[in-house]
Structures are given as C-alpha cells and as structure tokens.
C-alpha cells in the first residue's frame, strides 16, 4: 500500500493536490453548518430511570420545569398593584408562546416558594418544548425576547437547565474562537523555530487545516443522524491542529533527513512514505483505537467525542499520507526555502545529540535515574485517592454568567428547594388511598421536607391541602409526585435520598420512575462506571494487539501499557488537585467541585491515545535500528537520538493546541485543555526521556521476547518498516534554538 501511495505522489503530484484543494473546499463548506446542528448537554444515559422519568413527564405532563425566569420589581415588592399588573401581563404573554408549556408563576398561584424572602423577586417556571435540537433553538429565541427589561417596570433574568444550556453553548463558541487565536500563531512560531524555514513550517499547518475542516464536515454529517455535543468542536480543533502538525512534522523531518544523505527527491519521498508514513498510519490506529472506546458509553457527550476523535485522527493521518508526499515532490529542495536568520544545519551525528546522551546516562544507572522520576509522578497521582465525581451544572460557567447568578439568587433568597426536587412519575392510575400512603412514607424519609401530590401535601407524615399547582400532578393515566428536600443538590446526602426513595415500596401494581437532578447524577455515575471496565478492556486489548503486530514482542506492549498508566494517573491526580481541591481556582477563575465524570473518562481516552502516539514515534525508530542488527541498548540510544528532538517538538506543538483551551471560561473545558497538554509533556519528557530507556535497559534482550508460535504469527501478519535505511544517516536539517 505504501509503495502505491509513494508512486501516486511522485507520478500524479499536481493532480493529487488539485483534488485535495477541491475536497478541502467542499469539506469547509459542509462543515460551516455544523455549529447550528450541535447540542449542549448529553451527560445522561437515555436508558436510565431518571431520563425515562423525564421523558414520561414530557409526554404525559407537559414537561419538567427547565426554564426559571427571575423577575424583580424595580420600585419595590412584586406584590404591589403595579408590579402585579406587569407580572400578570408577562405571564400571559409567556402562556401564549407555542414553545412553552406548564407556565406557573407567583402571581397566579400565590405560592410562598415562588416569592423571595424580601418580596422583591418572584419566579416564573416553565418548560421549553422540543427535542434537544429544537429545545435549544426555542430557548435561544425565548431568551432573546424576554431576558432583560419587561414593560420598563420589571427586570427579567433567566435560569434553569434551558438557560444554563444556552449559556454553555454560547461560551463554547467563544472559547473555541479564543483558543484558535492563541494556538495558531504560537504554533506557527514554534514551527519556524523547529524547522528554521518558512516553507517547511507552513506545510504541517496545511495538514492541520485539512484535518480540522474535514472533522467539522464529519460532525455536520453526524448531526443529521444522531445527537452531537457542541463541545466536540473543541476536541476536533485541538486534535486536528495538534495531530496534523505532528504527522506533518514527522514526514517533513524524515524527508529532509533523506535529502541530507544525497537522495533524490523521488527516492526521499519513497523512503519517507515507507518509514514515517508507516509510523503515521500505525500511530493513528493506536490513537483512534483509544478514542473509539468512547463509543461504548450511551451518553452522547462522550459518543460525540468518540466520533469526532476517530474522524479527526483518520483525516489527519490520511492528509499526511496522501497530501504531504505530493507537496514534498512539488517543492523538492525548496522545502528549505525561507531560511530564518537563526537557522543553521545540524550535521551532528545521532550519538552527539542531547537525547542520545540522556539515554546513555539513564541506561548506565537505570534504577537510580528512574526511581526519582517515578516517585514524583506517583506523588502527583496521590490526589486520586480522594477523588469524587459529579456532573456539570451552572457552576462550570463563569461567575458572571446570568444563569449561574440566577441559581445563586434562588438558593440564597428563596425558601425551599423546589427546583432541585425529586420527580416521581407513575405511568398508570393510582387510587387515592395507596397514593396517600406512599406520599406519607416519602415525607418521612431523611432529608425530605415536603411531598406534593395531586391529592394533598405531606410534611413529615402530616397531610394538608394540596398546593396551587396540584392539578398538573394528575392525569387520567398517570400520577406525578414532587419530593422537596432540605439537602444541598448533588451532595452525598441528596444522592442517598434518591436511593431511599427508590428502595421504598411503591403502591401495588405500579412501577415509579424517579427523576430530578440528584437522580440524574446517581444514574450517570452508575451508567459510566458500568461501562468503564469495558472501555478500559477495549483500549488495553486493542493497544496490546497493535503494538504486538508492530514490535513482534509481548513485553513491549506490556511495558508501554504500564508507562502509559503512569502518565494517566499522574495527570488525573494533578487535575484532581487543581479542579476538585481548587488550588488554582483564583488564578484560573473556576469554582472547585467534584471531577466531572464524563470529562474524566474523555481525558483517560485522550491521554492514553496521545501517549501511544509518542510511544509509536519512539519505538518505531528503536525497532528499525534493532532490526538492522543493533543491540537493545544501542538501538535505544540511537533511536532516541534520532527521534528525541522530533518528539519534543511534536509534543510542544500538540501541547500548545490543548493548553490554548486552558483559557476557556467553562471549567470542564479548562480541565480538558490543561490536562491533555500536561499529559503530553509528561509523556514526552519524563516517560520517553527517562522511564523508557530505563525500562529497556532493565529488560535487556527480553524486551523483544515472544513465544515461538507468536513469532511465527508475527512473521506472517506483523507490521514492520520497509527496507532498512543507511545506518550512518545524519540528523535532519532543523533549527537549534
């Protein structure tokens, strides 16, 4: 296959480039519509009890409250004649909106729970209709119309899940724009520093642009057939920019290395495709395999990242394999055009490089050099011992976000906790007596302060008349029960209450479904934790198989998996220290809270995949030299000498694209950017620079061990580099800073 790719590039270079330009333009046009199709949310399991409860409420009762309008009277209390007149006019207008249902307010119920403690603010509750796509559009339109000042007499601010989702969607776009403004110029500067040539520096960016536009087109197509999270665009941008540049860097470096040996342009391209091209293809396979594990999770937030990640990796690799070679053919020696003032040719041999010297130093005393590094990484991982998990809420938004401010006001200025109430829905008729008995038992559970049913209100076992909104709790073929608690939403106690409610014996012949934000958290934890063993198993198994096919050894995959696990736990430990314990909260401007579970899973797959990316970069050259007859120690020294600077440069470039998202205002996107970028640097420096040579030295010849039958299997089906390259090939011409 690689021979055909090389020959196609050599014989039809300009035709391939024309096709690539046309395809890129088409992908750009298709991808431009992606943003309007993508959705917020996606953290719930569609098959979970809480999601089914919400769906049943939507179907039978007009929907749960997902929009809270906080209305403030400008001239005093909201129950003055003037304020009441304007308030009722606002509610009447809202009830005419076809996109709203179940509009309830203080002015038409006189419910004390909808009036602030000082009487200056009141709540209007409503449900925004529609599937996730339409609901998001409806919420945006409604907020445009009602958020702000009403009749010059009332101030209206929006909160609730619909408003939080709207604010998140807006923030995602703003964060992406800022990250791109930071990452692209910094990346170009680093590329100029690495290559010392304007032309060579621009080529990897071309691959990155193709990868990003292609992945946006992929997301646009996917959004037509399934729900796709809007935050997937951030992953495609970071991965597309980073991997496109990484793969381009690897191809260009090998091409320049071959030109430096005196090879013709055509032979240099052939050799580049056969060696670096194979490495790119294999590296992309390992990264894609890790990201594909996200597809086992039912939450579309995670599945979106799986689709987006696999797609952008495939497009980046395909661009490097099919677009970069014809570019190199057309440019030839002009790839070094536009030399920067600081650039000078590096003619030093591999043995003289800093990475070769580091490898030799480590391998002289492998245990002595590895143990301190390992100790530091394990200390970094120690915060994982206290990790707790949660799901995103308004606290992931910046403090000045309106929906977050509304939530804070509700908690501070209003009595009760109605917006966080557990919602119990029964999809069949229930007689009054068993319904009352069930509600009475619910009201006596620890943490419950009030239970609302269609027939009465229950407080600690005492029944009183039904509340103003009780009519909406009953349907001919269903009942709805609201359990209001005194507990902090998403706290351990609130989650325990969910378990207590579900454990309670329901009315005979009924099967209640329990929903609400606390139930959603419990279900999300259960759903994700239930799939984690499968995801980890798939990642480990596919990685082991791919690395065995590449190396012919069963020891090398185990060594790689162990070292990647160290990178992973160190990174997650540091993220726990920062985002859960809040040590950098003042600097980064986020609110410390439990680790977002979906993002933690996402980081596991990304960190694992990117660690394998650099594992392949380094191992491919070590194996190449070992296959040429060098012993393990010599192959490691010379392999790191050849790849050390390339891996370091690639890591810095990829880290920049992720660190740029550390400027995000959404805290879980900050964690995504900082965590992924940090993991890349840990892996490229501490793991590849110290622990890999130390482990290889300690393993010695056994590093390449495989049972006889597997060696036979590998000789027939394994992957390997093509014909060996000249042993004395000098380093590529790159700039030394």
Per-region residue spans from a language model:
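Conserved nucleotide-binding/hydrolysis micro-motifs of P-loop NTPases
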Residues: 74-76, 198-199
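Membrane-proximal amphipathic alpha-helices
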Residues: 42-43
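Structured non-transmembrane domains adjacent to transmembrane bundles in polytopic membrane proteins
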Residues: 46-66, 75-165, 386-585, 668, ...
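Membrane-embedded transmembrane helical bundles of large multi-pass transporters/channels
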Residues: 1-37, 100, 130-389, 507-509, ...
């Amino acid at each position: 296959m690689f021979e055909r790719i090389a020959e196609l590039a050599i014989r039809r270079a300009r035709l391939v480039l024309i096709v690539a330009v046309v395809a890129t333009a088409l992908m750009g046009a298709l991808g431009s519509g992606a943003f309007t199709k993508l959705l917020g949310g996606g953290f719930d399991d569609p098959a979970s009890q809480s999601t089914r409860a919400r769906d049943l409420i939507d179907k039978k009762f007009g929907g749960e409250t997902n929009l809270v309008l906080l209305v403030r009277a400008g001239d005093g209390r909201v129950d003055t004649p003037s304020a009441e007149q304007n308030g009722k006019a606002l509610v009447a207008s809202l009830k005419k909106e076809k996109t709203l249902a179940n509009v309830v307010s203080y002015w038409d119920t006189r419910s004390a729970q909808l009036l602030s403690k000082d009487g200056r603010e009141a709540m209007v509750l409503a449900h925004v209709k529609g599937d996730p796509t339409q609901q998001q559009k409806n919420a945006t339109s409604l907020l445009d119309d009602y958020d702000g000042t009403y009749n010059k007499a009332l101030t209206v601010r929006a909160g609730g899940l619909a408003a939080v989702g709207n604010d998140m969607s807006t923030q995602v776009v703003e964060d992406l724009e800022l990250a791109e403004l930071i990452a692209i110029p910094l990346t170009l500067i680093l590329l100029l520093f690495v290559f010392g040539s304007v032309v060579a520096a621009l080529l990897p960016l071309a691959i990155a642009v193709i990868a990003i536009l292609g992945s946006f087109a992929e997301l646009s197509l996917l959004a037509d057939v399934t729900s796709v999270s809007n935050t997937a665009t951030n992953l495609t941008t970071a991965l597309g920019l980073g991997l496109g540049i990484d793969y381009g860097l690897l191809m260009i470096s090998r091409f320049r290395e071959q030109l430096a040996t005196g090879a013709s342009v055509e032979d240099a391209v052939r050799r580049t495709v056969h060696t670096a091209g194979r490495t790119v293809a294999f590296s992309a396979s390992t990264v894609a395999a890790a990201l594909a594990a996200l597809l086992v999770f039912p939450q579309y937030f995670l599945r979106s990242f799986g689709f987006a990640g696999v797609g952008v990796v495939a497009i980046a690799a395909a661009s490097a394999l099919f677009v970069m070679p014809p570019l190199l053919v057309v440019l030839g020696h002009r790839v070094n055009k536009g030399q920067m003032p600081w650039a000078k040719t590096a003619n030093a041999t591999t043995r003289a490089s800093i990475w070769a010297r580091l490898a030799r130093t480590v391998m002289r005393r492998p245990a002595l050099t590895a143990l301190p590094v390992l100790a530091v990484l394990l200390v970094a991982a120690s915060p994982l011992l206290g990790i707790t998990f949660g799901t995103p809420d308004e606290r992931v938004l910046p403090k000045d976000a309106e929906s977050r401010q509304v939530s804070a006001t509700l908690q501070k200025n209003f009595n009760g906790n109605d917006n966080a109430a557990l919602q119990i829905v029964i999809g069949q008729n229930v007689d009054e007596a068993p319904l009352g008995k069930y509600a009475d038992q619910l009201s006596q559970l620890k943490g419950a302060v009030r239970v609302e049913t269609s027939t009465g209100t229950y407080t600690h076992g005492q029944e009183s008349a039904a509340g103003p909104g009780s009519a909406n709790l009953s349907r001919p073929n269903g009942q709805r029960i609201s359990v209001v608690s005194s507990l902090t939403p998403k706290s351990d106690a609130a989650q325990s209450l969910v378990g207590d409610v579900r454990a309670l014996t329901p009315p005979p012949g009924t099967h209640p479904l329990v929903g609400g934000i606390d139930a959603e958290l419990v279900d999300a934890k259960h759903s994700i934790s239930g799939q984690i063993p499968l995801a980890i198993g798939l990642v480990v198994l596919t990685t082991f198989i791919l690395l065995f096919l590449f190396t012919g050894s069963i020891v090398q995959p185990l060594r790689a998996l162990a070292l990647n696990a160290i990178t992973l736990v160190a990174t997650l430990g540091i993220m726990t220290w920062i985002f859960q314990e809040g040590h950098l909260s003042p600097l980064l401007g986020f609110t410390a809270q439990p680790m977002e579970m979906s993002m933690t899973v996402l980081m596991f797959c990304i960190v694992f995949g990117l660690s394998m990316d650099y594992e392949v970069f380094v191992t491919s050259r070590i194996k190449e030299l070992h296959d040429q007859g060098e012993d393990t120690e010599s192959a490691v020294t010379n392999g790191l000498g050849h790849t050390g600077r390339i891996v370091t440069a690639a890591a810095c470039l990829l880290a920049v694209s992720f660190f740029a998202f550390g400027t995000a205002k959404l805290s879980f996107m900050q964690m995504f950017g900082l965590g992924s970028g940090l993991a890349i640097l840990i892996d490229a420096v501490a793991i590849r620079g110290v622990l890999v040579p130390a482990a290889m030295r300690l393993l010695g010849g056994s590093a390449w061990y495989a049972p006889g039958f597997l060696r036979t299997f590998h000789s027939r089906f394994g992957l390997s580099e093509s014909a060996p390259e000249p042993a004395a090939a000098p380093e590529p011409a790159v700039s030394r800073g």
